[in-house]
């Protein structure tokens, strides 16, 4: 029999209890084996007649075996209980660490709330003071009205307002909405979700940057980045997100080297923390390719764009709309390198995806067809380009007015009929001959207006002047700006080349995102996954950026300087240019250089013979 173990007086630790239990289990298993060896001869059938006392020995051995089995079971229960207690303790430690993090975050939020409350209090005080000043000014104004000997200078009070009304057009026409293809991609990053506070911070930074207040947006990003690195460390997905936001702000300031450094850092962090095949890595690669494209480094941008395409095909499948956006980006890069065959291949793939997944009426289908037609023009495939242009116009017509029949024809059919019957009539038919198709331009995307002008230029090359005039007249009646004269000029230049040269002019370096993310999305990327969109001329353009606001302010400042100097004819008002919200905005714009074709976004226009038109463009169409 084994010796009895007496408990020690001191308290045993959990590890000591586990070790002691394991030792007891080994001893009990050995003892069980000995008992079974002793019991086996006694219960064997060939034992013959039982010896005296063997029955009692058998009973005692059986009782001992039962006690041993019970002891082994209790020892196993003790081990299982010890393992469970260890797991509970580990979970307890995790919960404590989480509580500490939540306490820190709560403290940070309390500090932010306190600061915001102070700002709100100061704002309320300022509002109250301004309201009091307003009441005082109203009182003084009433006194002046009652004064019969009012000073003549008082009549000049409305001059600044009238001057601004002359300089800025009415705001009846709103700017076109962002492209539907630039959806938010920030939430589509696999297992990583961007925190809500970073989304809020991104929106705040975008607001400041859109107002040109980079002196506020950049320090805000840097402070948030510093706080994130202190709390989460440098190699954290949130840090990569913040780096991406700051890079986009730098990119909008034309600080491309700083933006490239930040994007490379964000790419390294995301590859390390999220894996090399994560959608967020693809979004960062795309943003980096956009940046290289803006700097004219198309060869360096192409492998980045291809890698982003491989990741998205692997994660999302080869027929996802985001894959089509990436294919369009890659096609634009190849187009700027003169790789016409690859451009055609990528646009065809993108068109197939858009038509299959989003339907034939999606704006991206018409936009991609327009870009593919531009590619055909560069290759001299005029018949293929004409077919695509007609498909775009026919689809737009059917969407608005139903299927095509003898009485319901798209505009290009009317144009060709007018061309055929031009010798039979002296005067041009009234515009009502087209039916009511021209109204479709008011509700369709700018791609329709682009197509009208491009097909008109193609007709003009073929000598169909009446048909070309019909389409151009229809496009000019469109109040929404679809394609600026610069783009039309570039299409005409392509047609004049005849042979479809591959040598592209240096295109605009502005390329933007679609999603978004848009948004990085692209908030993240913020993503939005940035998408480059062509205008049918092969140049790279940027959508969803601050370029529209900058161009409007630049032209406003030019007109203001001319107005103040006097004697210089004023440019016709642009319906997409908004009024400045304050004189501070206007003064800031006046101080900026206004040389046409100089620095800023004017450098990102395609170089062509229509440089004067390029300097007057109001936005980057996407």
UniProtKB/Swiss-Prot annotation:
Low complexity bias (residue ranges): 538-547, 601-622
Cell compartment(s), UniProt: Cytoplasm, Cytoskeleton; Lysosome membrane
Cellular component GO terms held in the UniProt record: cytoplasm; cytosol; kinesin complex; kinesin I complex; lysosomal membrane; membrane; microtubule; mitochondrion
UniProt cross-references to SUPFAM superfamilies, sorted A to Z: TPR-like (SSF48452)
Cysteine-cysteine disulfides: none
One function term, GO molecular function aspect: cadherin binding
Compositionally biased region (Gly residues): 180-190
Bilayer disposition of the protein: Peripheral membrane protein
Chain positions covered by the region annotation Disordered: 145-191, 476-548, 563-622
Positions in coiled-coil regions: 78-143
Keyword Oxidoreductase: no
SMART domains: TPR
InterPro entries assigned to the protein according to its UniProt record, in alphabetical order: Kinesin_light, Kinesin_light_repeat, TPR-like_helical_dom_sf, TPR_rpt
Bias (Basic and acidic residues): 145-164, 493-509
Biological processes annotated in GO: lysosome localization; microtubule-based movement
Predominant location: cytoplasm
Pfam families referenced in this protein's UniProt entry, alphabetically: TPR_10, TPR_12
Positions of TPR repeats: 198-231, 240-273, 282-315, 324-357, 366-399, 449-482
Entry keyword set: Coiled coil, Cytoplasm, Cytoskeleton, Hereditary spastic paraplegia, Lysosome, Membrane, Microtubule, Motor protein, Neurodegeneration, Neuropathy, Phosphoprotein, Repeat, TPR repeat
Phosphoserine: residues bearing it: 151, 175, 179, 445, 508, 521, 581-582, 589, 608, 610, 615
Quaternary structure and interacting proteins, as annotated: Oligomeric complex composed of two heavy chains and two light chains. Interacts (via TPR repeats) with PLEKHM2.
General function of this protein: Kinesin is a microtubule-associated force-producing protein that plays a role in organelle transport. The light chain functions in coupling of cargo to the heavy chain or in the modulation of its ATPase activity. Through binding with PLEKHM2 and ARL8B, recruits kinesin-1 to lysosomes and hence direct lysosomes movement toward microtubule plus ends.
Disease: Spastic paraplegia, optic atrophy, and neuropathy: A form of spastic paraplegia, a neurodegenerative disorder characterized by a slow, gradual, progressive weakness and spasticity of the lower limbs. Rate of progression and the severity of symptoms are quite variable. Initial symptoms may include difficulty with balance, weakness and stiffness in the legs, muscle spasms, and dragging the toes when walking. In some forms of the disorder, bladder symptoms (such as incontinence) may appear, or the weakness and stiffness may spread to other parts of the body.
Family: Belongs to the kinesin light chain family.
Name of the molecule in the record: Kinesin light chain 2
Organism: Homo sapiens (Human)
């Amino acid at each position: 029999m084994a010796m009895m173990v007496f408990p020690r007086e001191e308290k045993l630790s959990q590890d000591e209890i586990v070790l002691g239990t394991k030792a007891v289990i080994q001893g009990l298993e050995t003892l069980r084996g000995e008992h079974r060896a002793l019991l086996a001869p006694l219960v064997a059938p060939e034992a013959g007649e039982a010896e005296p006392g063997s029955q009692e020995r058998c009973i005692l051995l059986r009782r001992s075996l039962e006690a041993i089995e019970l002891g082994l079971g209790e020892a196993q229960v003790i081990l299982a209980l010890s393992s469970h207690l260890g797991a509970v303790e580990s979970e307890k430690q995790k919960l404590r660490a989480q509580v500490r993090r939540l306490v820190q975050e709560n403290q940070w939020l309390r500090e932010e709330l306190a600061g915001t409350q102070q700002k709100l209090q100061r704002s309320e005080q300022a509002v109250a003071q301004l309201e009091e000043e307003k009441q005082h000014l109203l009182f003084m104004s009433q006194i002046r009205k009652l004064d019969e000997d009012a000073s003549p200078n008082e009549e000049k009070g409305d001059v600044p307002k009238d001057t601004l009304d002359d300089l800025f057009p009415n705001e009846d026409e709103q700017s076109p909405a962002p492209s539907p293809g630039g959806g938010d991609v920030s939430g589509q990053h696999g297992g990583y979700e961007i925190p809500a506070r970073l989304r809020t911070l991104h929106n705040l930074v975008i607001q400041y940057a859109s107002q040109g207040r980079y002196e506020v947006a950049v320090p805000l990003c840097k402070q948030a980045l510093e706080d994130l690195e202190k709390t989460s460390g440098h190699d954290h997905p949130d840090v990569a997100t913040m780096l991406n936001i700051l890079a986009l702000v730098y990119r909008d300031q034309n600080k491309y080297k700083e933006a490239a450094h930040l994007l490379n850092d964000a790419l390294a962090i995301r590859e390390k923390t999220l894996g090399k095949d994560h959608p967020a890595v693809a979004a960062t690669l795309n943003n980096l390719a956009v940046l290289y494209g803006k700097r004219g480094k198309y060869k360096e941008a192409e492998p980045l764009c291809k890698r982003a395409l491989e990741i998205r095909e692997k994660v999302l499948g080869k027929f996802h709309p985001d894959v089509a956006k990436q294919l369009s980006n890659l096609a634009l890069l190849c187009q700027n390198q003169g790789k016409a065959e690859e451009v055609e291949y990528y646009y065809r793939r993108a068109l197939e995806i858009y038509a299959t997944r989003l339907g034939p009426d999606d704006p991206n289908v018409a936009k991609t067809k327009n870009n593919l037609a531009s590619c055909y023009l560069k290759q001299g495939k005029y018949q293929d380009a004409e077919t695509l242009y007609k498909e775009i116009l026919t689809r737009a017509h059917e969407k608005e007015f139903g299927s095509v029949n003898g009485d319901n024809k798209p505009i290009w059919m009317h144009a060709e009929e007018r061309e055929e019957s031009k010798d039979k009539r002296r005067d041009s038919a009234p515009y009502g001959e087209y039916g009511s198709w021209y109204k479709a331009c008011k509700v369709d995307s700018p791609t329709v207006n682009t197509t009208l002008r491009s097909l008109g230029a193609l007709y003009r090359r073929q000598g169909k002047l009446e048909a070309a005039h019909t389409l151009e007249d229809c496009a000019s009646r469109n109040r929404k700006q679809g394609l600026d004269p610069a783009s039309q000029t570039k299409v005409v230049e392509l047609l004049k080349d005849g042979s479809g040269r591959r040598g592209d002019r240096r295109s605009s370096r502005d390329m933007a995102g679609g999603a978004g993310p848009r948004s990085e999305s692209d908030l993240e990327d913020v993503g939005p996954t940035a998408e480059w969109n062509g205008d049918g001329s092969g140049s790279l353009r940027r959508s969803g950026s601050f370029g529209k606001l900058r161009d409007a302010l630049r032209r406003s400042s030019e007109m203001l300087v001319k107005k103040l100097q006097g004697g210089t004819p004023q440019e016709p008002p642009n319906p997409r240019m908004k009024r400045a919200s304050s004189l501070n905005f206007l003064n800031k714009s006046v101080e900026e250089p206004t040389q046409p074709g100089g620095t800023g976004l004017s450098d990102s226009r395609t170089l062509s013979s229509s440089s004067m038109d390029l300097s007057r463009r109001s936005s980057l169409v996407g």
